[in-house]
């Protein structure tokens, strides 16, 4: 794994947590009034996530990625991501998180990331020695996770940006509850933050605008599912689905041995 790709990978977990924080909902009482404004539904998620303090998530990735060969984009053999999994835990108050990624179709690739005490530890056994590497975390992101007021301000600003366009979809059933369905777009420019992430993508992949769909319980607003459709130009499209659970359960996240 090249250094730009490894740096991008170590930043992916805090970014993912920030996105989850922006769009997760978990607040409540039995007489919660119905919400109709998609922005209000997402704003309720900030307060609810802070109230829960911890959560578990499990996800899958599907789709195909075609890398470039000989400088021609999209000419390589397709890599199928079906069966890939993502599992992790988040402790917002403790500013800690862990995630494990498995891609069976890519030589059994596995990756682990642990963010704790302002340090991000990364391990990708398929590359290098298989040991842990460490890098100072992005303090502003870690600090924002435990600051509801700041997240509310960031959310309001994000939803008003051009191209984001949050909107309501038809309500759906999610398990034993009815759920709001809200969609919005994360423009590629918001993800890349310039050219650094794009430059780190391998094989001529080109990140496009990401379509996000969320399911939020209507009885006591709480996010239960997320779906990200990630276009990669001629390199294909990847869908990542996440399901959140175990809100408020005890979580133990510590620096890895040898990290």
Where are each of the predicted segments found?
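Subset-of-secretome marker
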Residues: 27-259
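Sec-dependent bacterial lipoprotein signal peptides
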Residues: 1-25
């Amino acid at each position: 794994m090249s250094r730009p790709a490894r740096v991008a990978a170590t930043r992916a977990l805090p970014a993912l947590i920030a996105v989850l924080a922006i769009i997760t909902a978990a607040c409540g009482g039995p007489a919660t009034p119905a919400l109709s404004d998609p922005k209000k539904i997402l704003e309720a998620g900030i307060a609810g996530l802070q109230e829960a303090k911890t959560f578990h998530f499990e996800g899958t990735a599907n789709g195909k990625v075609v890398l470039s060969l000989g400088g021609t984009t999209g000419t390589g053999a397709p890599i199928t991501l079906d069966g890939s999994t993502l599992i992790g835990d988040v402790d917002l108050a403790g500013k800690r998180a862990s995630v494990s990624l498995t891609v069976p179709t890519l030589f059994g690739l596995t990756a682990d990331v642990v963010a704790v005490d302002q340090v991000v530890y990364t391990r990708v056994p398929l590359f290098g020695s298989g040991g842990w590497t460490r890098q100072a975390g992005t303090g502003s992101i870690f600090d924002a996770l435990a600051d509801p007021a700041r997240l509310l301000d960031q959310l309001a600003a994000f939803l008003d940006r051009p191209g984001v366009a949050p909107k309501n979809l038809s309500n759906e059933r999610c398990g034993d509850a009815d759920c709001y369905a809200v969609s919005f777009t994360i423009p590629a420019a918001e993800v890349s933050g310039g050219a650094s992430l794009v430059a780190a993508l391998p094989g001529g992949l080109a990140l496009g605008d990401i379509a996000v769909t969320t399911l939020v319980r209507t009885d006591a607003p709480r996010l239960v599912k997320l779906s990200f459709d990630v276009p990669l130009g001629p390199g294909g499209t990847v869908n990542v689905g996440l399901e959140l659970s175990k809100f408020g359960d005890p979580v133990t996240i510590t620096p890895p041995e040898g990290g």
